[in-house]
Amino acid sequence: MPSAPRKQSKTYKVPRRPFESARLDAELKLAGEYGLRNKHEIWRVALTLSKIRRAARELLTLDEKDPKRLFEGNAIIRRLVRLGILDETRMKLDYVLALRIEDFLERRLQTQVFKLGLAKSIHHARVLIFQRHIRVGKQIVNVPSFVVRLDTQKHIDFALSSPYGGGRPGRCKRKRLRSQEGGEGEEAEEE
């Protein structure tokens, strides 16, 4: 346990109305499109987005030349640009308010693996990540919700230890190869 205890807080916020049909349909569509396992993953992103938008709204109430607005506003924008959520052509606080949940879901490792063509489907991408077949740079990442930065996006690849990345073949393939070698040996003995 760390020496300084931290205050734990919830990472997601449940909707105020649990059975609002329009929201339920929208969440189901998002979960299917981005291969999410449950609604908590959507709510977690929604909470992150709401915190960022709340900070941007508070900063927009200040005067344009206010040093706090300039400093904190630039920090928020720089962070979003580095993550690839905000485009470099739209580096203003007004554009931060226009962000959507989809902008954050696009930057997940699961989505990026599928978009790069390393996986056959978005669900296959999730399985590949969980089974430690994907690396970002030199680091194997097994968290589908890992947020990929712009500079590390080009380093997403199969892990060197993975059968997909030229590593040792999988258990079934090794068994098949062994049985083929054994079958060839028996044929030679019969002749």
Curated annotation (Swiss-Prot):
GO biological process: cytoplasmic translation; ribosomal small subunit biogenesis
Record InterPro entries: Ribosomal_uS4, Ribosomal_uS4_CS, Ribosomal_uS4_euk/arc, Ribosomal_uS4_N, S4_RNA-bd, S4_RNA-bd_sf
Entry's localization field: Cytoplasm
Keywords: Cytoplasm, Phosphoprotein, Ribonucleoprotein, Ribosomal protein, RNA-binding, rRNA-binding
GO MF entries: rRNA binding; structural constituent of ribosome
A Pfam family the protein falls into: S4
Modified residues (Phosphoserine): S50, S161, S179
Modified residues (Phosphotyrosine): Y164
GO cellular component assignments: cytoplasmic stress granule; cytosol; cytosolic small ribosomal subunit
Protein's UniProt keywords contain Transmembrane: no
SMART domains in UniProt: Ribosomal_S4
UniProt domain S4 RNA-binding: residue ranges: 107-181
Function field: Component of the ribosome, a large ribonucleoprotein complex responsible for the synthesis of proteins in the cell. The small ribosomal subunit (SSU) binds messenger RNAs (mRNAs) and translates the encoded message by selecting cognate aminoacyl-transfer RNA (tRNA) molecules. The large subunit (LSU) contains the ribosomal catalytic site termed the peptidyl transferase center (PTC), which catalyzes the formation of peptide bonds, thereby polymerizing the amino acids delivered by tRNAs into a polypeptide chain.
Similarity-based family: Belongs to the universal ribosomal protein uS4 family.
Record's protein name: Small ribosomal subunit protein uS4A
Name of the coding gene: rps901
